[in-house]
Amino acid sequence: RFNRNMQLLKRQETPTGNIALLGIFSAILAVFSLIIAFVPFTSIAFGLFLPLISAVAAYYVQKKYIPLYMVGASLICIGVTFFNIGDTLFFVIPSIFSGSLFGFMRAKKILPQFNIFIISLVQFILHVIAYYLLIAITGIDMLNVVVSLLNLNSSKDYMILFISALLSLSFGETGLNYLIIEGVLEKFSIETIKEGPIARMVSTSIAFILGLVSILMGIGIISSQAMPIIFVIMLYFSISGTDYLFSKIRPVWIYVLLGFLMIASLFFVAIFYQNENPINSLGLLACFPVSLSLVTFVSILENKMAQ
């Protein structure tokens, strides 16, 4: 029986095999959805592991069946939790879509940092849709409730901060999902996709450019309420690219350069910080990721030239 069950966890070539595998994983998701509906506080913990189910399903089935799975599994989960649909909309459905996309892009060998970025944006969009669906269903806008409790009605920035927080949540959640999914896929002897130096140079370049834009917003040269969103995206690419710098010992002058730029960043923030516009002034904090990205880029170039 064990060997017969394990036959499902391989690339499916027949319609029967594909549908059987997707049916099993849809049923598993339905069970977890019911647990979340009856015990809502489990939604956060399950939210980290639910994408794994869809990722495995999408990895092993033929790609033409993935849209069918995403729609079918979502409708099944909504159907079995009709009495408490909030957590299903906000946690389960995004997990189905993000996990399926992860499995698809994993099979296509798309680099992890771009895989995570795309899925994070999808997660973010689905969270926003779920937020407005909950308002339509319940008639309660939780954001307005929180804003009223904190006496922030006079603030024009609370919506952009909410969007930035939701985007940050999506990046953090997707990053944890990635670690969990990769850890499990390795158990199935699926080859890990390695990030080369060129991919890291692309990430650090994106972080550097977005960081400069954030800094210009912070000192008032560019005026835009989108600064917190740009800052969050910049921070993601900075983190995804600069781990190269600390993966092994680099030449001493690299760390000296990093220390000098970090100290210079402190002085820059202290000089240009504006109390009258604290939200945009937070863009000045991009000096630190920009310094890190620049030094990482230089370190990669130095390493390639030395080879």
Model-identified regions with their sequence ranges:
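Membrane-embedded alpha-helical hairpins and interfacial helices in multi-pass inner-membrane proteins
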Residues: 115-211, 216-227
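Short helix-perturbing small/polar motifs within transmembrane alpha-helices
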Residues: 9-11, 23-26, 92-132
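Long, positively charged, glycine-interspersed low-complexity recognition regions
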Residues: 3-8, 238-307
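Alpha-helical transmembrane segments
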Residues: 18-31, 70-73, 203-214, 262
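Alpha-helical membrane segments and adjacent membrane-interface helices in multi-pass membrane proteins
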Residues: 43-105
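Hydrophobic transmembrane alpha-helices
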Residues: 2-69, 112
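Aromatic-anchored segments of alpha-helical transmembrane domains
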Residues: 30-34, 74-80, 123-129, 212-216, ...
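Central hydrophobic cores of alpha-helical transmembrane segments
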Residues: 67-76, 115-124, 232, 253-265
